[in-house]
């Protein structure tokens, strides 16, 4: 049995593939905006590190491990970058840039470990966006991306900073990181994107055009 593909079908398939490839291709404006987001949030990361001691101490005293919830501020860059740029690698790139900036300004945890944490946390958010094939950018996905980044943060911290921690501490820390990641990184990033879109700052991005057509 011989099968043949009509020129029309071949052309349609080629067009679909080309459109998908173009949609995922980074533009100069994508790189610039992702970098700006990374730098801006990197300064926030650094500032959060400066006040971290007074903030985390009473929370940790209340329940050891609970301090992972506010630590989720350090995973917001990846979710925000992913929601704005909507391209493969955006979450990872933005979180990594933020970590590098924070490390360059000065991090109490050391430059290399700060950058390593950014890499891991960015991958956590990136994985969630990849699972949805970079096609779904709704609120639940933003929450899941934040939760994924929070989970990655918890695993990384438990391996590097809390090795041998008691099971109860590890459980509380992980749950707190996931919930904090979802609410702080996912929720706040989603709200930030909507605010920027309404202000017209994202008109060159699908995130901005999409909201304006609703």
Q: For each predicted feature, which ranges?
A:
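Short helix-perturbing small/polar motifs within transmembrane alpha-helices
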Residues: 38, 116-158, 190
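Hydrophobic alpha-helical transmembrane segments
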Residues: 31-36, 72, 76, 88-96, ...
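Short, highly charged, low-complexity non-transmembrane loops/tails of multi-pass membrane proteins
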Residues: 196-214
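Membrane-helix boundary connector in multi-pass membrane proteins
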Residues: 159-171
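Aromatic-anchored segments of alpha-helical transmembrane domains
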Residues: 38-46, 96-105, 147-157
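Interfacial aromatic-anchored transmembrane helix boundaries in multi-pass membrane proteins
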Residues: 98-127
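Membrane-water interface at the C-terminal end of transmembrane alpha helices
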Residues: 130-135, 183-200
């Amino acid at each position: 049995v011989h099968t043949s593909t009509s020129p029309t079908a071949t052309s349609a398939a080629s067009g679909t593939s080309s459109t998908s490839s173009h949609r995922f291709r980074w533009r100069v404006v994508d790189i610039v905006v992702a970098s700006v987001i990374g730098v801006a949030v990197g300064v926030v990361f650094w500032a959060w590190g400066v006040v971290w001691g007074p903030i985390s101490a009473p929370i940790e005293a209340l329940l050891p491990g609970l301090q992972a919830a506010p630590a989720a501020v350090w995973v917001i860059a990846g979710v925000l970058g992913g929601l704005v740029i909507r391209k493969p690698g955006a979450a990872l790139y933005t979180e990594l840039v933020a970590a590098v900036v924070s490390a360059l300004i000065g991090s109490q945890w050391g430059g290399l470990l700060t950058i390593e944490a950014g890499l891991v946390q960015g991958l956590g958010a990136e994985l969630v966006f990849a699972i949805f094939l970079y096609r779904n950018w709704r609120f639940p996905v933003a929450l899941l991306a934040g939760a994924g980044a929070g989970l990655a943060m918890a695993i990384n911290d438990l391996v590097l900073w809390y090795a041998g921690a008691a099971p109860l501490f590890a459980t509380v820390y992980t749950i707190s990181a996931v919930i904090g990641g979802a609410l702080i990184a996912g929720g706040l990033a989603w709200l930030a994107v909507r605010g920027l879109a309404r202000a017209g700052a994202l008109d060159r991005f699908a995130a901005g055009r999409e909201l304006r057509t609703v």
